[in-house]
Amino acid sequence: MQSDDRSVREGSDSSQTFLMKMAQPTGELTHPSQQQQLQLQQQSFQSIFGGASDTTEEIDTETDSNHRRPHSFGAAATTPAKLANKNVAPFLVKHIPEQYGPLGSRRTDKLEDLSSPNSKFCYRHRPDLKCRRQADEPSMDKLQRELETLPPSDQQGIAHVWSLFSAAPAKHRKLILQGIMAQCCFPQLSFVSATVRDLIRIDFLTALPPEISFKILCYLDTTSLCKAAQVSSRWRALADDDVVWHRMCEQHIHRKCKKCGWGLPLLERKRLRESKREIELRATTWDVSGPAQNAGGAECSAPHADDVITQKRKADSSDDETAIVKRHCSSLDARPEPDEDYYTTRYRPWKEVYKDRFKVGTNWKYGRCSTKVFKGHTNGVMCLQFEDNILATGSYDATIKIWDTETGEELRTLRGHQSGIRCLQFDDTKLISGSMDRSLKVWNWRTGECISTYTGHRGGVIGLHFDATILASASVDKTVKIWNFEDKSTFLLRGHTDWVNAVRVDTTSRTVFSASDDCTVRLWDLDTKACLRTFHGHVGQVQQVVPLPREFEFEDHDAECDNDNMSTTSGDTESNSLQATLGLESNATETSVFGPSFDNGRPAPPRYIVTSALDSTIRLWETTTGRCLRTFFGHLEGVWALGADTLRIVSGAEDRMVKIWDPRTGKCERTFTGHSGPVTCIGLGDSRFATGSEDCEVRMYSFRN
């Protein structure tokens, strides 16, 4: 301790000598203001190195009275060691311990705040706070080199001034700074201003808790997030984390973002929703010191593959949500217990998922795609469906062909129908087809075997759709037939007055939509077998009806329907018909508007449907009110084929054109040509779509690459 005091005293001597020397006038001071300014400087030095009264008592004689003049420091210069020993050293000894551990006075055992030992400091001065600014290595290196150019005595003086300021409490620091700033000239003040502008910046993301940092980053768009990741390694870990990009995927994938207007192609929404809880928990336990994969999300600690599915997006994107979920459900039981390599290689970070979807979405927007043509049928292609790398097509040549979409190779041909095939649908295990020979056939499409044949219609089958255990078929005989695979029951839905061209089953609400040549669309209740609602508006035969996913959102102020030219009728009450005709909204719940057969516990049918007709138009409807929200104009002839999801509508018509529409604005985004005959069928996926035509060809447009 004695050596420390000795070094402090030596530093004090040199620093006082330095200060006195710096304050020496370079010439005779004649102006009163200059004399007054120098007198203030002397008083400030005396306040640091000792009171004027103590010094005066020792040297205040008649002979040396001239030393009290502003331009003379002779007396002060003769006793630097005494003044430093008396004032500077005690100042440092008193304040330095309190600067780094303010637990009370050194002479007492009283603790001021055990829970927060640095409670005396603001958030910028607390030594234990993470946001305390680190030293700037280039600046400090430059400062060191400039300091070394000065004489040793000047170096010690400057260093001791720094020590005094560093040891001073906050109140003292403000006084010192105010005194220094008062003596600075304009160039010096300009230098201070430029320097402070950079010094007052803090790394707020590092200082805040991780969950708050993630909350801030979730407000940024993708461009800003990518720029934030370039700031530092810490920012990169935060900006690239699954917590942020899961939210970005949730906001954009399979829906239009209300902020930026962007929507990205389909993703398994079920997994996206299920993983939300895991992501929220992860945000509160995030640690940058963890493994590098923590930010990217390649590592998982879930004990079972089910948990992995809820956390990570499967590496190989697919085109249909339902089929993917079914495939995983059927294969999880036989899947071995996964290890860490399984997670790392099979599941990607959400940022990679978003990047892949964004690339596909951009290709959709600008029409960048590759085209593949499938030739093999000898008559017009009337129906098709694709899933992963499998494409099934049905034709008026009475055959069904199975294709490999990657190679374009024809895998097999299914033969058995006696007339043209108008409709088909397949899943992992079976393919069901409907033909003008009045029959439906169930096939094992992997082997080509016909498993069973169903007859029940008195006319050709021109439309079918199955969901879970319910199959609906539409026929030339003006009826819709419901087949229940579970209890083997069947029944007919009668009401249309002309051919029924298309049907769609919604097992969630236990309802069926049907489109007919009588220019109407009907909504049926499978429980009561009653028609809940009839949609009028088309002036041509309605060829297709497609319910939109429940995630689809439409702003009412965007509606531009002409209610004078459309109407809807309900199978229950006239009041509902009048209300829907006028476009008024009911005060009842969404389910009750469909009649007493719907109780509060029964899910409502899909809220929006899209229809196409031979009047060359496409219409968007709201099922709860029966309103036509939008009419799409652009095709020159009747629209035969239709596909839709939450982001777009794809239509094919007699005019041999395929058009892509924005369902919210009604704008035609792009038109594709290439077929030499009417476009009769369309299949739509997340990154591609396929069209079939009476020219016997199938064309597939891929936006993936």
UniProtKB/Swiss-Prot annotation:
Pathway: Protein modification; protein ubiquitination. One of its GO terms (biological process) is protein ubiquitination. Residues 202-248 form the F-box domain. Residues 1-42, 55-80 are annotated as: Disordered. Residues 33-42 have a biased composition (Low complexity). CDD domains: F-box_SpPof1-like (cd22147), WD40 (cd00200). Coiled coil: none annotated. Keywords: Repeat, Transcription, Transcription regulation, Ubl conjugation pathway, WD repeat. Residues 1-12 have a biased composition (Basic and acidic residues). InterPro entries: F-box-like_dom_sf, F-box_dom, G-protein_beta_WD-40_rep, SCF_subunit_WD-repeat, WD40/YVTN_repeat-like_dom_sf, WD40_repeat_CS, WD40_repeat_dom_sf, WD40_rpt. WD repeats lie at residues 376-413, 416-455, 457-493, 495-536, 588-631, 634-671, 674-705. Component of the SCF(sconB) E3 ubiquitin ligase complex involved in the regulation of sulfur metabolite repression, probably by mediating the inactivation or degradation of the metR transcription factor. Component of the SCF(sconB) E3 ubiquitin ligase complex. Belongs to the WD repeat MET30/SCONB/SCON-2 family. This is Probable E3 ubiquitin ligase complex SCF subunit sconB. The gene is sconB.
